[in-house]
Structure formats: C-alpha cells, structure tokens
Amino acid sequence: MLVPFVVFSFLGYCLNVFNLLTSGDTNWVHYALTPVKELVLGGSIAGNDVLWFLTSLFMVQIIFNELKTRNVKSWLIVIVAISIAVICHMFDITKPAYLANVSMGIALYSLGYMLRDIQYDKKVFGVAFAAYIAIMLIEPSHIDLRTNTLNENGYYILALLFSICGCITVNNIFKHIQHLPVLTYIGKNSMDFYVMHMLVLGVITILPWSEWMIPNYVVFGVMCIASLTVPAFIGYLLEHSRYSWVLGKTNK
C-alpha cells in the first residue's frame, strides 16, 4: 500500500511540476515546501492528491489491528472514533485532515467488522435499504470523508447513517446479482485504477483541446475511456514484469 503511494505520488509531483513550469510559476516554495506541507497536513500532494486514501487506510488498519490485539471492544472503538470525527466537525478542526478521516475510517472499518455477517440478513438489509432511500429523498446528508465536511443543509448523524446503510445496500445488491466481468476485473485490480486514474486525467487536461476545437463531450468521453483502459493496460504490463512491486503485487 505504501509503495504504490510513494511511486505514484512522485509521478503526480512530476506532473504538477510540469504544470507549474508551463504556467510560468518561478516560486521555489511551490516546488519544494508546498508538497511537504500538503503531505503533512493532507496526507497527499498535488498531482495525485486522491492518494490521501492510501495513507489514511494504512493508519486505519494499523490502529484497528493494534486495538483488537489489545482486546478493545469494537463498539467502543466505533463510539470513540465517531466522537473524534464529530468534535472535529463541530469545532471546524480541518488540519491535519487525517485526524478526522482516520477516525471516521476506524469507525467504518469497525462497523464493517461487526456487521460482516449480519448485514446479509434480510431484515437488516430491508431496514438499511429503507433508511438509505428515505435519507436520500427526504433529507439528503453526506460527508466528504477526506475533509470531514458536510453537504449544505445536511445533518452529520444522518450522513453517518446514510453511509452505513449505503454500504449494506450496495453489498447486498452485488451479492445477489450475476457477476459482471468488467466490474469484477476492476474490483480485483482496484489499486491499478485508483493510483493511475488521476495521472491519466491530468495528462489529458494538459492537451490543447480548445485549440483543436474538440467539443467538451468528446473530451469527456476520452477521459472516461482512458481512465478505464490506460490503468488496465499499464497494470497488466507491470503485473507481468519484474516491476509488479510498484503496484504492491508479487510477480506472477
């Protein structure tokens, strides 16, 4: 997990440096110090900032495993973790970002551990599905997990419930439908798509589409297709080479 983070963060950094240079930015701080600040406070750097999830997930797994080793009850972990996230939201504590998102991650990770079997009970699924739809239609509430920010007019507790019920709903739906090869492939190789898609989009946005008079919908189509095909192709090449470690995989 950390190896893909380091490798693809560096590639994102290179892409961001290229953008800064072509925009005429000559402030050395933006090249040397800003990335460090972004990493320390946000968990990732510009150019491939979606990788914050890997650092947060790494911390979540380490902390959760340590707590379970010490026989801390899962329900207690959930309560404490959610309390920290709620306090961060109430007092607008946004830095470092992982204080809140790791806490929320630990809570959701613990809930997943607690509900791993019972979530497929028909009654549990029915209640979760009903709550999910009700919140979506009556009082839409959702949280940006990276920044712990709530949507306008949303309610934090409802947003938590919405996320949990949404996970249960999606898990049940995909458990009972026929496996789709495309989705199965993406799921098995999710790391490839996750670490590469922003780089692919970043390269595409550099191209002078407006000068070429290419319509926006065509550019959007190119982005969608490239985000699916390029990571799959590069991932396949890496996986079947001595560089499979780049994606955190063992060589086949």
Where do the language-model regions lie?
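Alpha-helical transmembrane segments and their immediate juxtamembrane cytosolic regions
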Residues: M1-K252
